[in-house]
Amino acid sequence: MAAAALIRSTRCNTCRRYLLQSFTRVVGLTAQNSRLPNEPQRRQFFTTPYLNIKSSHRHLSDRDASAASNNEYFITNESANSSQAVPWYLQVEPVIEPTHPAVRQQEIPAVPANAPPITQEILQHLSLEIGLDDMVLLDLRGRDPPPALGGNVIMVIGTARSLKHLNVSADRFCRWLRSTYKLRPYADGLLGRNELKIKLRRKARRARLASSSGTISDTSDDGITTGWICVNVGSVDDPSVVQNMREGGFEGFGKVQGGTRIVVQMFTEDKRADVDLEQLWAPKDNVKAGDSEENHSYSTGGDYQVRSMPPITSENNSNHPISNVPRPLRRVDLSQRRSFSTGAGQHSARTDVDPESGYEVVDAKNESSRQEPPLSAIFSTLKEMSPEETIEQLGSGPEDKNSTEFLRDCYSSVGTSHNGNSALRLMLGAAGVSAQHPGYTKEYLWTLFLEQTASGYRISEPLGFEIASAFLVPRRLDAKEQGRTASEFVDFDIESAMRVMDNLSLNGETIIRKHRVYNMMYEALILGLRNERLDDVRLKALRIRTLMTEIGLDWQSEDTRETMQLRLLLGDVDGFYEIWHAIAFNEGSRTADDYELLFRVHAEAGNPVYARECLGVWISMMGREDPPVLPSASIISAIARCAHVAGHDADTFRLLSASDEWREVERLILSDLRTLEQLT
């Protein structure tokens, strides 16, 4: 029965297939499914000629599959060998990955030529130790006009990561400069280590109190979080120069003035983008493309040729053809904007016409050059006159133009030139104020100065010096204009002189480095001692000394000792000894005249404390000078007067730690001291 059932099952195609699969599973073989007759024919394509397929119904056996794998391995090796056979100049170079943005932020800028040796060390410290990013170095040396920080400045700009990092960076940088290079940097905008924390805590407390009471706290800028700190490193000197100065073998204190000034600008990221100092101090060639297109339309018109025009004025017919001179399209600018040119143009004596506006343009530079010879002669004549002659020749006042022959010659020489008349009136006004002419006042001179500068005319340095000196001349005793006090008059005079110096310094003049102008300011303050408190006068003297220190004046001129004397008379002891130490530092040794001035000025100042300190320190130093300062009649008299002001008497005063030469003349000092006691 089983055999009959088996035979019947083989008649069915499906049953027969199932029966065969049951046997093959037991043996461990895998049955191959036959392709259905309705399946479309497929042809397999290969890239190698080693495999040939005759029919789509033919299947690869195990031996054929192994042969195909061997052929594929052979093809792979052949392609590798073919790539190695390619010459080096035909091989494709591997793609180099771009630098990480963090690496670009920490790049150190290149040091310019002839920079101080400390510049590279400062950049290394700011980048590696401080951690400033996106550092930029701007070489402002030789900039015309020079920046307000000075004419020899190297500026470094960097970005701090946060407000806290900004304050910590500036504080650590200043401490590093003081400890490593013994410099005295000044950080503008830097708060102390705990001061910032305290102020921020107080600000947060006020905000909480305001929110609890239902009011809105003041969110205006309180100066705490400015996001900008300017570290003025100061004048950086060449170490070789300092070493050569130290090898001189002198005694004293001070430092070498001059050199390159380094300024480090530290910003937060937002503040740096807002201020944009790089664009402000960038050279003219590196301006932005947008600004260049707006302000210089002709520079963006493509390549064009320029013909040299004849210097004479000629009228050309516009119908004449001009070849090979392509010109850009003319752009009409309707915005009200004034353009200033810094280039040197071709100046002529004629009056040109502006092609854009149609107005006549007067060449003020040529006009001033034509009027320079008569004005120079008038200026020389005024300087040679005495005050009495000046008052007589200037007539009754500013409105007088023909009462004297001198005035008629002056106004006829300048003609109708506006610049010449303005400069002449300014020159006569300065001479009249200096001679204390009753018709010329300092207020009138100040008005003339404002008119001259507002018109755009430059003032020469000699004339500017005369104007500043005229403002500092003592006023007449009967001057009671507008009911102001003597202190207010002195403040007006000094402020006016400083404004004149500031205007000239912006034009590149060197009047701001003249000691004589500052000495006249000190003399004006001394005249105000009778009507003003001593503390107020000292504060004004300190302001003048700070200005002189920031400018970096050298103490080698003839007016240096006069400046030193005036400072002590005004109570500025620190300013006095600043110059006193600089004399030894610059000249190598002090002379007998210097010590005579030292003791005499302390006696004239009349301060017992300063006089006692001077006697206790500098009498013993005279024997240590090279060459030693020997006794003389003038120094003996000055020491006696200084001892009298200090409160010493002839019975108790002795020369302590003095040299043998000075011990021998001690009796002469005591004799002069007894004479002074008898006179008082």
Swiss-Prot record:
Q: What is its main location?
A: mitochondrion
Its transmembrane ranges are none
Composition bias (Polar residues) maps to: 311-322
Q: How does it sit in the membrane?
A: Peripheral membrane protein
Locations listed in the record: Mitochondrion inner membrane
**Bias type Basic and acidic residues, positions:** 286-296
Span of chain positions assigned to the transit peptide in the UniProt entry = 1-60
Q: Where is this region: Disordered?
A: 286-326, 338-374, 384-403
**Which PANTHER family has this protein been placed in?**
ATPASE SYNTHESIS PROTEIN 25, MITOCHONDRIAL
What is the protein's name according to its record? ATPase synthesis protein 25, mitochondrial
What organism is this sequence from?
Talaromyces stipitatus (strain ATCC 10500 / CBS 375.48 / QM 6759 / NRRL 1006)
Q: Which gene encodes it?
A: atp25
